[in-house]
Amino acid sequence: MAGYTPMIQQYLKIKAEHQDAFLFFRLGDFYEMFFEDAKKASQELEITLTSRDGGAAEKIPMCGVPYHSASAYIEQLIKKGYKVAICEQTEDPKAAKGVVKREVVQLITPGTVMDGKGIHESENNFIASVSACSNGYGLALSDLTTGENLAVLIERLEDVISEIYSVGAREIVVSGSLDADTVAQLRERCGATISIEDGETDEHVTIIEHLNNEDITKTFLRLYTYLKRTQKRSLDHLQPVQVYELEEAMKIDLYSKRNLELTETIRSKNKKGSLLWLLDETKTAMGGRLLKQWIDRPLIRVNQIEERQEMVETLMSHFFEREDLRERLKEVYDLERLAGRVAFGNVNARDLIQLKESLKQVPGIKQLVASLAHDKAKERAKRIDPCGDVLELLEEALYENPPLSVKEGNLIKDGYNQKLDEYRDASRNGKDWIARLEQQEREYTGIRSLKVGFNKVFGYYIEVTKANLHLLEEGRYERKQTLTNAERYITPELKEKEALILEAENNICELEYELFTELREKVKQYIPRLQQLAKQMSELDALQCFATISENRHYTKPEFSKDEVEVIEGRHPVVEKVMDSQEYVPNNCMMGDNRQMLLITGPNMSGKSTYMRQIALISIMAQIGCFVPAKKAVLPIFDQIFTRIGAADDLISGQSTFMVEMLEAKNAIVNATKNSLILFDEIGRGTSTYDGMALAQAIIEYVHDHIGAKTLFSTHYHELTVLEDKLPQLKNVHVRAEEYNGTVVFLHQIKEGAADKSYGIHVAQLAELPGDLIARAQDILKELEHSGNKPEVPVQKPQVKEEPAQLSFFDEAEKPAETPKLSKKEKQVIDAFKSLNILDMTPLEAMNEMYKLQKKLH
């Protein structure tokens, strides 16, 4: 560093302590970056890379962003997984001797973003910490924006990854000694930034006083130490650590959460099209976050589920009160995150006005809930603390429409502070004098166009047009500025009043800022109560959300049994909404004694996967306390749900379709219990026909004989339907479809027994593959059916005399010799089909489009 200027040496010294972050180095009105930071930032932010003299032989790479717009650039970097260290000037440059003192005041990371576009209002922003323990792993979670803290002990790394995926943590704090393979899996499979923390805070941390497990304490302390080191400010809003166990809720593994599209769709990763999208009728950001948490962790205790159901039922039966509640909740801002900003010290006056406006709604909400004709509702109302003292404090202190900045005045009401009132009187009196001065000078000089003005450079002035300069008394005015058509003057008396006014205004701004910080500290004392109130409001919001969606979509209150599944006229909730005005075909599902497994056959795209997902989603909705899309629903409490549905192959990590199938099947087979729900869709499709069939049968037999879980198993292997005669708990069902005028018509009805036809080659005809190719496929199919052997290249002329072993939708006599001539309507449908961008659609959207095309043919 010897050859560099003192400022660059200062930069390098600070940068050495933050090697894993972009260092935003404050220089006047800019944050500057140098050396490799500058090169990389210019690429990531698409800003100009320049250079400057730093004292060495070669110029130093440099780029920068304006201070006032830095947050947008920081958000871009954080979104890409980077960290940003904010280095501020900590002394007045005018008073500095030598290089201005600077230090890092905050390290912003993906897991510690507090506001801005970097976080979604209805999503938590958890940061995770993972530690190796004697019996597995410790996992701690903290959301700086809301103050929530969670911790859990987990045996398997797979479950750790699943939990991190569920909460959407974008940053994971680990020890430098954690196994490298574990760290690599966390980074790659969770898509998170990995941060190392080996220090340990020496302060007394009150939010862990109640913990009695050393592994959990160690894991959370590592996370707390990291937060304290990076944020360099108060963490008073952090709530006591809530310890939970995975077994306290329904476990839904990583694969199943993706396959069932609980919170985002598989292909687009968007909320739209997911169960969360369907259910989200919440009115507050807090309620939206809680709803997602409930979907991620359905309940397994019937009494807890029924408590939610009772409140939902009560709200459904009180339409006007529910609508009033929704309107009031709409006026409640994000109390959790407002409390977090108060604690962090970055709250502004508008935030406190939002807090005030929110608190104004609480008494009405409390009274409304108390009026509901249900004992539990009245008990809930009693627990609501309106925080009236906080409301009174804010109403006394703040103007209704304060500026965004807290250092420009106009924050604090008249009458709140005597000294402030005196300063304001001085300022107002001075301005009144200035206003009178203009009239006096006009009368004295006889210049009607004379005016008194103000600017930040010269202060107050008297402006006279050049045509009237001869009317000014010599020696009375001092020229200050010459304009094209006028001159500006000052007088000793004017400067004297100006000094008094500016001093008063400066005092006002300083005192208002001081009073505002005092107000903020007073509000900080109420944070625990505000957080408790936020919890009450978010629960009410989530429950009214269930009541609203249940009534609007005609859902039914589910009942719970020990072992029986009885779903009458069940509907897939998301598909039903996507279909909108089109008629949805409901289906039954009956499982229980001597009927633990359903083997589902039927044509491709007939609705097998939809039916299976439907049962899983109905079960999840029931266990979060919502009503369900069915005429009647009786369900057991499922402890876990496992799925293998769809073609979400993990090609990026090098895993093929078949490997993904086997991994997901293994996860279910190893971890499922008799109280679990298993959905297997087309197991064995990723390998050869006989291998796939053998594995599918072996999996069915193993689940039947060794696990006994409720299982829905769809297959294209018709040969497996004979298992109904061998396995007492297995029953065949099929999706009904019929042939009409040479076209397959999906009826989407689940019926007892096995399917007897398929239509794979017909789909190829619909896709308008060449006629000779279609004809050749028919020949090959017949040859395979005749030989009963593994697929080989058969002779051209088919000789089929016996009943086909594989499913075929058309009988031999009906096989077209060539592609039939298409009608105008059929051609239009095919053109529409070809124009569909299938890769950009979710499975549900694709199914909906196919249904629309099918309707056009009839």
From Swiss-Prot:
GO terms for molecular function: ATP binding; ATP-dependent DNA damage sensor activity; damaged DNA binding; mismatched DNA binding. GO terms for biological process: mismatch repair. The keyword Disulfide bond does not apply. SUPFAM superfamilies: DNA repair protein MutS, domain I, DNA repair protein MutS, domain II, DNA repair protein MutS, domain III, P-loop containing nucleoside triphosphate hydrolases. Disruption phenotype: Double mutS-mutL deletion strain have 40-60 times greater spontaneous mutation rate. Cells lacking this gene have a 225-fold increased spontaneous mutation frequency. A double mutS/mutL and a triple mutS/mutL/nth disruption have a 200 to 280-fold increased spontaneous mutation frequency. Induction: Constitutively transcribed during vegetative growth, with a slight increase during stationary phase. Probably part of the mutS-mutL operon. Belongs to the DNA mismatch repair MutS family. This protein is involved in the repair of mismatches in DNA. It is possible that it carries out the mismatch recognition step. This protein has a weak ATPase activity. Overexpression of mutSL partially suppresses the high spontaneous mutation frequency of a ytkD/mutM/mutY triple disruption which lacks the system required to prevent damage by oxidized guanine (8-oxo-dGTP). This suggests that MutSL also functions to repair mismatches due to oxidative stress in both growing and stationary phase cells. This is DNA mismatch repair protein MutS. It comes from Bacillus subtilis (strain 168). The lineage of its organism: Bacteria, Bacillati, Bacillota, Bacilli, Bacillales.
